[in-house]
Amino acid sequence: AGTYYYLHRFVYDNPKSEEVINSIWNNMYNAIANVNILLQGIEDHRGILAADEEKIYEGEAYALRAFLHFDLLRLFGKSYVSGAGEKAIPYVSKISKEITPLSTVSEVLDSVITDLEKAAFLLENDPVRTGEATTSFLGTRSFHFNYYAVRALMARVYLYKNDKVNALKNATEVILSHKYPWVEKGQVATTTRDNRDGIFLTECILMLNNTRLETITETYLKKSENNTVGNLLVTQAEVRDEIFENTLYGGSDWRYIYYFEPIDSYYVNTKLWQVSSSYNNRQPLLRISEMYLIAAECAGSKKEALEYFNTLRQHRGFEVTDDLKEEDTTDEKLQTAIGKEYRKEFIGEGQWFFYCKRTDQATLPNVQVPFSKAYYVLPIPDQELEYGNRN
């Protein structure tokens, strides 16, 4: 697509690429500044809010600060496995005119975990756990950084840090809560898109109410008189078949059947199309499927790992006969299969790129240019380097 042509080819110093990268950096740190203002306001005015509400707002703020910094780290810092001790990004934890120094990858992850631990403590009596919301604003907890979203993010962060024990602990807590049931086939396998659940709504632990989704999907995922295929984010038919292992599993995967629409000789991903009012403006950030993949990767035994892995695939249209068997599955084969599921499950969401970065993959399939691991790290904007004395 036009705006992302150079990013798609990892040309980060092109003006169009720099515009996108600078916007990500500036907007996310602006959001962090607003979170810090909120936290300072809560600290300076204790007792104005009811005690239970104050804890929830404060807990959500700590969680959001951690979430924003973690994604900045995944974009602008090296992976933990390739550069734990290398300088990455500033972790801004207070309102100050002073320049925040860069922290290492490991230090950022420690700060993220510290904020998430504070959030989990403050959200202990979250309405998502008690079932009692004192105000309407505190309802519909999947639109807020709720307690289980904190645990899910902790699972993601700990795995990024290669701490599989704590990653498994947090992932299984979310799984065992039974708060996020698998989507029913009838919600996905609809005859038209008018009432199709493209995001598997019941499985969403945390999501955005993104009122710009229609504009985004109309711009990048739908063809019109003024929007040709050359401007769209499209997938070649053979690449779609490869991603979903069509020759091996016969195209039974719901994500293969119901996530795409043909346009000319290509396909576009449709899961975020704004068709049904029941699912409008909903953009998933954390889902129960990721917890199953994390549990599969971190489980203490192969039997347990395969139970998590096969359960996920059975709820995506796979037959029990397609289950991976313990006697036929090496550790390497299981890890490869987990990577393939990340690619299928989070297509169009970016999580598979971060999976490849976390696991230090030397190559990426279907890229337009020869790949280098250097492409995993976005450049910090020049303005930040200049005025932050980062050079």
Language-model segments: which ranges?
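Long, intrinsically disordered, low-complexity segments
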Residues: 278, 282, 328-391
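Hydrophobic-face positions in mid-chain alpha helices that act as interaction patches
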Residues: 144, 165-288, 368-391
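Structural motif corresponding to the intra-repeat A-B loop/turn of tetratricopeptide repeats
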Residues: 72, 161, 300-302
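Conserved, well-structured interaction surfaces
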Residues: 2-76, 98, 102-104, 123, ...
